[in-house]
Amino acid sequence: MDHIDKKCSMNAIVGTTNAGKSTLINMLVGRKVAAVTPKVQTTRVRMHAVLNNENVQLIFIDTPGIFSPKTKLEKFIVKHAWMSLKGIENVILLLDVKNYLNKHIEKIISRIKQSNINAILVVNKIDMVSQALVDKAIEYMYSLHNFSKTFTISALHDIGLNRLINYLCEISPSGPWLYPEGQISDAPLKFFIAEITREKLFLSLHHELPYSLSVVTEALEEKVDGSLIVKQVIYVTKDNHKTIILGKKGEMIKKISIESRSELEKILDLKIHLFLFVKVRELWQDHLNECVGYVE
């Protein structure tokens, strides 16, 4: 297919923490490319996820939730969220309908207005509330901004996503694809593998741990038999956080390792040898490049 016949668009997904951005990304692409947990602020850097639909390539930018930053890490997170609005065709404001009065919504809409980018409202989690509440949330959102289009969905249960995809394909401009066919994400393998382990940590310990932990994939080594050795360091800020992750007689970290390895083997279709280490680094949030690997 000649590139003249092709269409391509960049679509940033923004919203408050836990609006369901990563779940939506994964459902749209049809494969896990972003960590999904009930803990707020699990997306830390911008990531491109790719959906090819016939002659159209839709690129979705998974962004951190918008919140009030305090530490250097949090400021970094928010800065990169807003950077996602540069050079794109559409901004999708994903709204948790149960939390439509969130105090950060107006701030997000203010930045969207400044960007002068086509804004689409996507109301999520409609399966959890009444239609009356959905209507009330939409009315409130339109009192803040005149969105070009509105969709009501349940990302978790794949309700309403086809209508959103069809609309984005319809309005995408003509142009060459930015990613080769078959590629679903621009996340480096080390980062992607770390995200899987970080997800398992939050799912197992989100009631006990803050989000201020990081997983770094320090080494990947392919063995002769084709299997992959993965060595990861889990950075925490306090000794008691390390104790929680290790668990009694090492049972918790063993559980997390098994769950992470199992999912990685399923996704990568490889035998994985996963080694997890836990290190305490006070205020690691202020040493991003040293122990987290973020690059501005």
Curated annotation (Swiss-Prot):
A Pfam family annotated for this UniProt entry: KH_2
UniProt-annotated binding residues for GTP: 15-22, 62-66, 124-127
BP terms from Gene Ontology: ribosomal small subunit assembly
Membrane-protein topology: Peripheral membrane protein
One cellular-component annotation, GO: cytosol
PROSITE patterns linked to this entry: G_ERA, KH_TYPE_2
CDD domains referenced in this protein's UniProt entry, alphabetically: Era, KH-II_Era
Keyword Ribosomal protein in record: no
Domain KH type-2: 205-282
Primary localization class, coarse: cytoplasm
InterPro entries: G_ERA_dom, GTP-bd, GTPase_Era-like, KH_dom-like_a/b, KH_dom_type_2, P-loop_NTPase, Small_GTP-bd
GO MF entry, a single one: GTP binding
Annotated ranges, domain Era-type G: 7-174
UniProt entry tagged with the keyword Transmembrane: no
Location of the region described as G2 in the Swiss-Prot/TrEMBL record: 41-45
Region (G1), start-end ranges: 15-22
Subcellular location: Cytoplasm; Cell inner membrane
Disulfide-bonded cysteines: none
Annotated segments matching region G4: 124-127
Keywords, ordered alphabetically: Cell inner membrane, Cell membrane, Cytoplasm, GTP-binding, Membrane, Nucleotide-binding, Ribosome biogenesis, RNA-binding, rRNA-binding
Functional note: An essential GTPase that binds both GDP and GTP, with rapid nucleotide exchange. Plays a role in 16S rRNA processing and 30S ribosomal subunit biogenesis and possibly also in cell cycle regulation and energy metabolism.
Subunit structure, as described in the record: Monomer.
NCBIfam families xref list: era, PRK00089.1, small_GTP
Protein name: GTPase Era
Gene that this sequence comes from: era
